[in-house]
Amino acid sequence: MSVVGLDVGSQSCYIAVARAGGIETIANEFSDRCTPSVISFGSKNRTIGVAAKNQQITHANNTVSNFKRFHGRAFNDPFIQKEKENLSYDLVPLKNGGVGIKVMYMGEEHLFSVEQITAMLLTKLKETAENSLKKPVTDCVISVPSFFTDAERRSVLDAAQIVGLNCLRLMNDMTAVALNYGIYKQDLPSLDEKPRIVVFVDMGHSAFQVSACAFNKGKLKVLGTAFDPFLGGKNFDEKLVEHFCAEFKTKYKLDAKSKIRALLRLYQECEKLKKLMSSNSTDLPLNIECFMNDKDVSGKMNRSQFEELCAELLQKIEVPLYSLLEQTHLKVEDVSAVEIVGGATRIPAVKERIAKFFGKDISTTLNADEAVARGCALQCAILSPAFKVREFSVTDAVPFPISLIWNHDSEDTEGVHEVFSRNHAAPFSKVLTFLRRGPFELEAFYSDPQGVPYPEAKIGRFVVQNVSAQKDGEKSRVKVKVRVNTHGIFTISTASMVEKVPTEENEMSSEADMECLNQRPPENPDTDKNVQQDNSEAGTQPQVQTDAQQTSQSPPSPELTSEENKIPDADKANEKKVDQPPEAKKPKIKVVNVELPIEANLVWQLGKDLLNMYIETEGKMIMQDKLEKERNDAKNAVEEYVYEFRDKLCGPYEKFICEQDHQNFLRLLTETEDWLYEEGEDQAKQAYVDKLEELMKIGTPVKVRFQEAEERPKMFEELGQRLQHYAKIAADFRNKDEKYNHIDESEMKKVEKSVNEVMEWMNNVMNAQAKKSLDQDPVVRAQEIKTKIKELNNTCEPVVTQPKPKIESPKLERTPNGPNIDKKEEDLEDKNNFGAEPPHQNGECYPNEKNSVNMDLD
């Protein structure tokens, strides 16, 4: 079972896997642990990652990058319209109103959704992980920014489903970093002590995120998060690009923005310059050859100029930091440490601003690039039964407050209730009770639209169906369970209607009593169990009680308040119903919970038909990529064979082919090379396979003759040594050598016979081989000689290595007063005289042992 964590960023991705030795960040086929989030489309296949980034300038219109923020957004979204101006590829609306990416693929114009593009990137990451782990990858944990809304998270899950990944959890970036930080800490305070507060700051390529986390031993709780979704390393690059565009326009009369390739080159050079300025404060040059119109351009900048240029961006850093402290009611003095991650935090001015705000040195103990991926892998290991991980509970926070709105039964007024406040513990479930006579709708939305970086505050509309009044005409109690799950997605998971069924008194047996008791708890204890179960995971049980108290005391919605007040009193009401009938002698009431279907109409969710179509399309593209790779491998094999033999035919292989064949083969190699770059440039795989077989028919015998000429003498030498060895042993046997006088003569004759036969065979083949020229096929191959050596050893070695039989010395009879043989016997006799009973060795004893002193020899 695979355990993989995927950090899917706007600019690059990282893959971390859990192994027996711990968490490891793995490298791709270019031995780079960083895989660019870039997909390039060609006439035959797709290229993803490093290879795609290398084509970004030459194939700008068909290379897609910086698409992460397009998830779950409509084409008319203001953010999409703004970003569209800076992209090298085209964005168009899809039929469902989403963002479509138009590219040329396989010689045709294609429209891909953002989910499909992300699925392509995940395909590459999955392939890289499988190549490293040597087994299929299915389960994983994927990171998302903490400010991603419900629609954006659902879109990422759809992308994972397209590629066949089972995403166990969508994990917030900052939560993953906190887990990676806390699980290895051995000095955390115990559960009954005050938690340690650590602030994590992450500035990546496109966003700035901060979070405050409370740590106890084996426990992590996210207290709050804050962010600026539009502040990242990309914005600093844009400042440099704007500066040099203006400079080049004045200095060289060149408008870099008029040509996308020139602009992309300038972006790449400005990014390099930004990184260099992080470690150098002196003036640094920027030089680009043949920038536009065959003109070379140059410029320079130092760190102080860069900081002055980005002063507006640097001022924005403090805004999320203030917001975080305000949300969590923390003071700067409460923060024990400040950890920074993310590539853009390497900018010295960014570090200085953060350190100045908190009034303490910032810590860089975590890997700035890989911390998120490692945290995701740890979370995946915790969720996986295949790994045993130290117990560590993770409680996340809801980034935006979520409310429900509904229409009152038989009334036009609407009821509103905030079910999850900002920074509420997650995952978490709550149960609401409604009094209804028929089906009703609930609409979920974000309570604070201004604080959500998404134009649509609505989450979805949920219709609770099959609701009916009680048989006596009273309203039915409908219990609705709302939940923010492990992915941070809001959902109405279940709905049930409490139905009262009257029963006859004579039918109320003891079994019915038990049934009544068993049916009643789902009304209240089941609710408590669900909430408590989630609370126990989240570790915030008192918060639910507080929320219930606040809800019961708040006057905005009388209907909901009265209903929620009924939940704690349900047991009392039921007790009255159970206790009263015997007094009044009325029919017994049995309470039954009826599950109700829920129809969900979400702001963003791919339909099953569309999702299946995307899965099928991705499968076809994966197969096409595989076929194209095999075709290219076959073509490269032909090209490699041509170059290899052309060099060796004029070198080591020259003696092993006759002159006429030599000239013909060289001519064929040249013709093949010309064919590869002309009509063979774009052929089917089988054409290259056939061409390689044609070359190998001539080249393989030459290569074999060369290899045989290298190996054959070594094998003959080894065979000669073995023959000489066994022949000498046979001669020593004939000369009555004591070493071999124990060997039977008939067996030694077998050795002599085998030696003579093999020696005769060797002489014959050596004489025959000597008559052959090097350009002719050998009489005998090295493998045949090796087989003869093995046969000779199998025949002779068991005979000549027979051990001599052991000669036993005669046993001497002992008399009671006989002399001692050696000191060891004397020691044993002394021990026996002191009353020690000697042990018998191997069950042997001397014939007169019973009549003599007890004595034994070791």
UniProtKB/Swiss-Prot annotation:
Principal place of residence: cytoplasm
Residues recorded as bearing N6-acetyllysine in the entry: K471
Pfam families per record: HSP70
Subcellular location(s) of the protein: Cytoplasm
Gene Ontology CC: one annotated term: nucleus
Modified residues (Phosphothreonine): T561, T815
GO biological process, one term: positive regulation of NK T cell activation
UniProt feature, compositional bias: Acidic residues: 504-514
Biased segments, Basic and acidic residues type: 563-584, 805-814, 821-832
Annotated positions of the Phosphoserine modification: S509, S510, S557, S809
UniProt-recorded Gene Ontology molecular function terms: adenyl-nucleotide exchange factor activity; alpha-tubulin binding; ATP binding; ATP-dependent protein folding chaperone
Cross-referenced PANTHER family: HEAT SHOCK PROTEIN 105 KDA, HSC70CB, ISOFORM G-RELATED
Binding partners and assembly: Interacts with HSPA8/HSC70. Interacts with HSPA1A (via NBD) and HSPA1B (via NBD).
Function: Acts as a nucleotide-exchange factor (NEF) for chaperone proteins HSPA1A and HSPA1B, promoting the release of ADP from HSPA1A/B thereby triggering client/substrate protein release. Prevents the aggregation of denatured proteins in cells under severe stress, on which the ATP levels decrease markedly. Inhibits HSPA8/HSC70 ATPase and chaperone activities.
Protein name, per record: Heat shock protein 105 kDa
Species assigned in the record: Homo sapiens
Classification of source organism: Eukaryota, Metazoa, Chordata, Craniata, Vertebrata
